[in-house]
């Protein structure tokens, strides 16, 4: 949602409940925003969260708070001058209800990412009206009631009572629409009854319908209608086109030269057009009947094009065309188009040139392919034929675009200012919006690419930190040459997994089983590593090596190393591992640590301390933790329970006194 909605909430909560209540609300929901920016997007869920927090602070119900927020918005947008727009929609409240969707269309440039709901006036009587609300958001039904109530009171002097008659997919307290696994998000549909004094509007409506000028109007043939609106088409209950104007059929043939011209009549409208406005609208009879007051924009779908065929159709001489049946004219046009298509095939190079961009203007060259045509108009119900007619005109910016579409000035509606606007180079809002939407789509794609790049960077960092400690990696990023460091004292841990290989299996099966077992054991060990107290150095074969005290200096390195060994022993003893066993050796002393290698850099430890720790592990017994004398004396002083093993013959060291680690100071 845009910040203006939250600005209104913040302003009136502070005004009516006080600044302290607002601060308390922000504290409850952990809102970091001290203020909101009008044109910035904020999370939708923030609105119900504020309502729940305000309800907890004031004792009012959640529905009351959402209703209050809706009233706040109407009172607040007058600061931006939007009250003038509301007052201009009509003399009566019902006029406003019929214009809500068109108001949202007007606002789409100021708030281009606005996900506006759709509202249609479905029924009226002396005592009020019924409106149908569609939205991708849930939990906003009470918010809308607050808006309607305040608009009626503020601009029309009416006191209304609004309540929900029917509701589909609306979830109180949330804003994200419900999900259907097969079709994705579901549309929230709510039907409201608004009770108010509507007698004056209904009387005006009855008087208008009963006026003598209406009763004496002569019958008009549909052919005359189609001549006046050459781009219009008529729809039946199945949304199939039953009649169409001459120019829309010719344009469709030019854009689809390989199609059967007779197939235009009788085809579902959504097979020929894409509905651009209103967005996300289901095109069916009931919906269009309810949305007759809403402006529609349909874009003709193109399936193929051949410029020679187009020009052939454009240059056809339709003699006695008024006396011809429309289908016969279509057949003639198709025959001419197909004749030129066969004799002037489009090669690959020409097809590629259709999407060329003029380097001087940045626009696509209209002479190298037809652009799709955009129709803007309104649906009207014709009672005599029980059909809907889409009265429209094409949106064309200038003469270049006119030719790019494949039309001429005399093809446009004979009435209105269509031709004058094209001659003047009028900038249609809908064309600008299409350009904006394309740029917005590119922006979204760029944003997704950046998010993907960030994700790859995080994965790369995680992989790097698995090979090199984070502090060392950060130093290398800063191009510091010093990647080698000496430590006065650390504790080195070696752990070996024993009896992994099953002699009864063949070599391949045994190797696979060994790898699976080692993977489980080492993965469990990784979970026990608590950085920065202990750092995993490497695994070699069946041996796991870790260190405490490097690369982050830790005066309690011996204690943390022993704690790790005890946790590991306890964890694996609790599981039935069969013949598999582990043994651990720990030694403390000085080491030198650094990054070795360039293509596959590794963080390595060097020194006699490492060798002694390895000997402690290799001379240990299964399910035992062997400590060097120095490490044993060090941890015994702080309460660890150790047992003297005596003297052990250590390769390269001779006789060494060692200890068994039994348990920690807490038992």
Swiss-Prot record:
It catalyses: GTP = 3',5'-cyclic GMP + diphosphate. Probably not activated by nitric oxide (NO). Heterodimer also exhibits some stimulation, some compounds (SIN-1 and two of the NONOates) that were ineffective at stimulating Gyc-88E alone did stimulate the heterodimer. Heterodimers with Gyc-89Da and Gyc-89Db are activated in response to changing oxygen concentrations, alerting flies to hypoxic environments. Under normal oxygen concentrations, oxygen binds to the heme group and results in low levels of guanylyl cyclase activity. When exposed to reduced oxygen concentrations, the oxygen dissociates from the heme group resulting in activation of the enzyme. Residues 337-364 are annotated as: Disordered. GO terms for cellular component: guanylate cyclase complex, soluble. There are two types of guanylate cyclases: soluble forms and membrane-associated receptor forms. Residues 427-455 form a coiled coil. Its main location: cytoplasm. Residues 491-617 form the Guanylate cyclase domain. It is found in: Cytoplasm. Keywords: cGMP biosynthesis, Coiled coil, Cytoplasm, GTP-binding, Heme, Iron, Lyase, Magnesium, Manganese, Metal-binding, Nucleotide-binding. Residues 347-358 have a biased composition (Acidic residues). Its cofactor is heme. Heterodimer; with Gyc88E, in the presence of magnesium or manganese. It comes from Drosophila melanogaster (Fruit fly). Belongs to the adenylyl cyclase class-4/guanylyl cyclase family. One of its GO terms (biological process) is nitric oxide-cGMP-mediated signaling. The gene is Gyc89Da. This is Soluble guanylate cyclase 89Da. GO terms for molecular function: enzyme binding; GTP binding; guanylate cyclase activity; heme binding; metal ion binding. Heme binds at residue 104. Pfam families: Guanylate_cyc, HNOB, HNOBA. Its EC number is 4.6.1.2. Binds 1 or 2 heme groups per heterodimer.
């Amino acid at each position: 949602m845009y910040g203006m909605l939250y600005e209104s909430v913040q302003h009136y909560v502070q005004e009516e409940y006080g600044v302290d209540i607002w601060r308390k609300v922000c504290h409850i929901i952990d809102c970091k925003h001290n203020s909101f920016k009008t044109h910035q997007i904020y999370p939708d869920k923030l609105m119900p969260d504020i309502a729940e927090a305000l309800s907890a602070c004031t004792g009012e119900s959640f529905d009351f708070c959402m209703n209050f927020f809706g009233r706040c918005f109407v009172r607040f947008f007058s600061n931006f001058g939007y009250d003038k727009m509301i007052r201009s929609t009509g003399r009566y409240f019902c006029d406003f209800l019929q214009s809500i969707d068109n108001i949202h269309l007007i606002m789409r440039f100021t708030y281009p990412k606005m996900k506006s709901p759709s509202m249609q006036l479905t029924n009226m009587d002396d005592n009020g009206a019924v409106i149908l609300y569609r939205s991708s958001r849930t939990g906003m039904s009470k918010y809308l009631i607050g808006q309607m109530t305040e608009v009626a009171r503020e601009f029309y002097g009416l006191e209304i009572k609004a309540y929900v008659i029917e509701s589909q997919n609306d979830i109180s307290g949330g804003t994200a629409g419900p999900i259907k696994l097969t079709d994705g998000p579901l549309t929230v549909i709510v039907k409201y009854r608004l009770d108010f004094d509507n007698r004056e509007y209904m009387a005006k409506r009855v008087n208008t319908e009963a006026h003598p000028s209406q009763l004496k109007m002569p019958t008009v043939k549909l052919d005359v209608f189609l001549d006046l609106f050459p781009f219009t088409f008529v729809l039946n209950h199945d949304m199939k086109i039953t009649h169409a104007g001459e120019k829309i059929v010719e344009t469709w043939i030019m854009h689809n030269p390989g199609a059967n011209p007779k197939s235009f009549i009788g085809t579902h409208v959504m097979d020929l057009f894409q509905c651009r406005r209103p967005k996300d609208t289901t095109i069916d009879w009931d919906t269009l009947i309810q949305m007759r007051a809403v402006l529609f924009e349909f874009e003709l779908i193109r399936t193929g094009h051949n410029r020679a065929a187009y020009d052939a159709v454009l240059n056809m001489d339709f003699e006695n065309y008024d006396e011809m049946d429309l289908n016969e004219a279509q057949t003639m046009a198709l025959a001419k188009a197909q004749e030129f298509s066969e004799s002037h095939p489009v090669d690959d190079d020409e097809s590629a040139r259709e999407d060329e961009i003029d380097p001087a203007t940045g626009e696509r060259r209209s002479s190298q392919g037809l652009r799709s045509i955009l129709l803007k108009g309104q649906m009207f119900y014709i009672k005599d034929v029980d059909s809907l007619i889409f009265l429209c005109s094409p949106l064309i910016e200038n003469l270049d675009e006119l030719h790019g579409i494949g039309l001429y000035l005399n093809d446009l509606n004979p009435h209105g200012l269509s031709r004058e606007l094209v001659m003047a180079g009028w900038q249609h809002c809908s064309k600008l919006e299409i350009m904006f939407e394309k740029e917005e789509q590119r922006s979204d794609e760029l944003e997704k690419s950046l998010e993907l790049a960030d994700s790859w960077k995080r994965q790369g960092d995680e992989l790097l930190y698995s090979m090199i400690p984070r502090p060392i990696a950060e130093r290398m990023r800063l191009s510091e040459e010093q990647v080698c460091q000496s430590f006065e004292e650390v504790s080195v841990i070696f752990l070996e997994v024993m009896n992994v290989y099953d002699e009864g299996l063949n070599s391949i099966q045994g190797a696979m089983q060994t790898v699976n077992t080692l993977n489980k054991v080492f993965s469990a060990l990784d979970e026990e590593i608590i950085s920065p107290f202990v750092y995993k150095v490497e695994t070699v074969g069946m041996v796991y090596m870790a260190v405490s005290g490097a690369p982050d200096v830790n005066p309690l390195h011996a204690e943390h190393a022993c704690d790790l060994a005890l946790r590991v022993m306890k964890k694996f003893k609790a599981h039935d591992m069969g013949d598999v066993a582990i043994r651990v050796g720990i030694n403390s002393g000085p080491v030198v640590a650094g990054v070795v290698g360039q293509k596959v850099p590794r963080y390595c430890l060097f020194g006699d301390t490492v060798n002694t720790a390895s000997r402690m592990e290799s001379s240990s017994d299964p399910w035992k933790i062997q400590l060097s004398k120095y490490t044993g004396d060090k941890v015994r002083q702080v309460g660890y329970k150790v047992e003297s093993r005596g003297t052990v013959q250590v390769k390269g060291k001779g006789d060494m006194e060692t200890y068994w680690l039994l348990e920690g100071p807490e038992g």
